[in-house]
Amino acid sequence: MSKRIEVYFVPADGREPAEVLAAKAKRAYVATGFNERIAEGDFAALKVHFGESGNTGHVKPGWLAGLIGEIGQRTKHAFLTDSNTLYVGNRSNSIDHLRLAWSHGFTPEATGLPVIIADGLIGRDKREPRSAQARTSSSKIAAAILDADALVGLTHVTGHVQTGLGAAIKNVGMGCASRAGKLEQHSVTHPRID
């Protein structure tokens, strides 16, 4: 019999005030008990998608206040992170990516945390951990993700052309990959309609 996995769900509506959503996110996070696993001095990555230019369908910085406060009680080395995109645009290099994040309010002044683009200036900062248990023998992961001692994913739900739904698994699976890792993931799958 497979192990039962607990899912924590808090109903939320993007039209609710940021303080209400921050309290709800904190409540769900605290319920997981994950914060107790973060040690003083740990590097804690808060993996978010900073949105696209002109986009409003992403997690807002104000919604993170409760989580950031909880994590901040455990370590002073927390940071917001994402990796560069494979496609050309405002998130394909760290300079434009940071400017976009800042324009959406993900600034140290607003959140209390720095933003680190996990795969470096142009997406080449990567490592290739190997595993006999994984579907592939190695994966190309953004270096700062592997340097972190803890990873907390903060995800919005979207439609996705290949999977039908993009959410937590895509935020971590694709969002923690380097550009080479993203290319590898996209090159081995092809949409099929039955």
Question: Where does each model-flagged region fall?
Answer:
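N-terminal and secondary-structure boundary signal
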Residues: M1-D194
